């Protein structure tokens, strides 16, 4: 899980979702997991 100031889609499987005010990226590639913070 990477914590970044701005999250971006890395590949076409990445999905940007918001869970209680936290922006996250979920993907089939676990190295692409990110959260904004």
Curated annotation (Swiss-Prot):
Keyword entries, A-Z: Ribonucleoprotein, Ribosomal protein
InterPro entries, A to Z: Ribosomal_bL36, Ribosomal_bL36_sp
Disulfide bonding pattern of the chain: none
Pfam families membership: Ribosomal_L36
Gene Ontology, cellular component aspect: cytoplasm; ribonucleoprotein complex; ribosome
PROSITE patterns: RIBOSOMAL_L36
Alphabetical GO biological process terms: translation
GO molecular function list: structural constituent of ribosome
Family: Belongs to the bacterial ribosomal protein bL36 family.
Designated name of the protein: Large ribosomal subunit protein bL36A
Native organism: Neisseria meningitidis serogroup B (strain ATCC BAA-335 / MC58)
Gene that encodes the chain: rpmJ1
């Amino acid at each position: 899980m990477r914590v970044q100031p701005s999250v971006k889609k890395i590949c076409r499987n990445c999905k940007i979702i918001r869970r209680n005010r936290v922006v996250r990226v979920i993907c089939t590639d676990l190295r692409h997991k990110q959260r904004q913070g």
